Amino acid sequence: MGNYKFRISEMLPNAWFHKLKDVTKHSKPKNKASSSSSNTCSKKKPSSDSLPQHSYFSNSLVANNPPHHNSPRNSLHTKKMSKRKTLYKPSLKPLTPPPLLVSASFNKSKINDQDSSYSLFPAIETSPESFVYSFYEEDDDDEFVEFSNFKINTKNKAFTKQKVKVIDSVEKACTASKPIKKPQKSHLSVKISRDEDDNEYKAEKKYQRQVSSGRKPSAGINLKRVNSPRIQLSGTRRSTSRRSESKQDVLESFAVMKRSVDPKKDFRESMIEMIEENNIRASKDLEDLLACYLTLNPKEYHDLIIHVFEQIWLQLTKTK
């Protein structure tokens, strides 16, 4: 109750208000102009019964609603305010442009044609000067672009260059990822024809059936041993005096599969044993022996076999 304010309208009955209105009409005569203005005001004003008990007014509404009549002071005040508005200019701070590749510029004439709700930069509309913001490429295109119909031109030179670079990088990466086949080092010039390879492969299959199972396989490297270097040779390469011996060698010879911890040593011993048993001294017979070892063993040991064969070849040439 301390903050509550009593009004006269709440304390007096409604009949007293009608009497007071009649007294004011008879006692105070007014001019026609003033009476007409007062009548219009009284018509516009609602009765006290319809008014709410509490009324609140905000300063912002009063400031935003100017009076209807234009006094000379108010007209001067509005002119001063309009002049002041023209003095306020937007700050020319660097706006962060969007990350676009296509050139775009804004013109005041085009922005003013649209509504203020649609405009993206309202500060530019109210300012008296025209501010043009543009983002250019290397080509310096001056085309005006509306953001409603904004589309990126993919036919631009920058896009084509970038695509070409991406394709080149992908192709380079693919070529780098491909395994490069290293050329096999030919330590010794050995000529082997396809027919001889086929014959050697067939002979290998024949003599692998007669594998000896004397030793248990230990952990190591596979090693294949051939007891006769003349498995694939035909009878035309030999003289008639040694044809019978070659037939016996082919019948008696067989391949042995072993696992070795020191393959270099085992290859050397096997080659020396084959040369001594069969009395191999001719260069053609030695080449056939090397070809036989290369075909019966995997490619991983070809370099090692050739290296061992070169050492044996040098020893044979020195003894001669």
Curated annotation (Swiss-Prot):
One annotated GO molecular function: DNA binding
Keywords: Nucleus, Repressor, Transcription, Transcription regulation
Skewed-composition ranges (Polar residues): 49-63
Keyword Transcription regulation: yes
Residue ranges of every copy of the OVATE domain listed in the record: 256-315
GO cellular component terms given for this protein: nucleus
Biased composition, class Low complexity, residue ranges: 32-41, 64-75
Tissue: Expressed in roots, stems, flower buds and siliques.
Role of this protein: Transcriptional repressor that regulates multiple aspects of plant growth and development through the regulation of BEL1-LIKE (BLH) and KNOX TALE (KNAT) homeodomain transcription factors.
Oligomer and partners: Interacts with BLH1, BLH2, BLH3, BLH4, BLH6, BLH10, KNAT1, KNAT3, KNAT4, KNAT5, KNAT6 and KNAT7.
Full protein name: Transcription repressor OFP2
Organism: Arabidopsis thaliana (Mouse-ear cress)
